[in-house]
Amino acid sequence: MATLEDKLQELLQPSVEDLGCELWGIECQRSGRFFTVRLYIDKKDGGVTVDDCADVSRQVSAVLDVEDPIADKYNLEVSSPGLNRPLFTLKQFENYIGQDISVHLRVPMLDRRKWQGKLEKIENDMLTLIVDNQPQVLVFGNIQKANVVPKFN
């Protein structure tokens, strides 16, 4: 069964691409009676500007008003992924092999939900993180949330 995020990705991706941006990912979050739809956009040829976010917000709002895929009232947020960019797809993870990432699991592994380490490799939906000099194999489907850990020199 497709999630709301999957449905929104399919619905909104063409509109975002028409504006010269990539739809990096979508988060839907409920906090009390408020519902937030957060879109992360990126550009291959440089950084995302405030104008890019405003243009995407206007375009996406129009599509959502017509298609009406969200039953509740919601707030729409559009931003760049930022330095600690969230990772949503295996392809995105592949781009960060050799870098530190932080992962939150749906179901604990070895009594831990939170893991941080160097992403060593990806094979058959399995990610290998080096944590405290030990390889830890995580199942992609068990990842609730993941982010790149920025390095500051």
From Swiss-Prot:
The keyword Oxidoreductase does not apply. Keywords: Cytoplasm, Ribosome biogenesis. Required for maturation of 30S ribosomal subunits. It comes from the Bacteria. HAMAP family: RimP. It is found in: Cytoplasm. The keyword Cytoplasm applies. One of its GO terms (biological process) is ribosomal small subunit assembly. This is Ribosome maturation factor RimP.
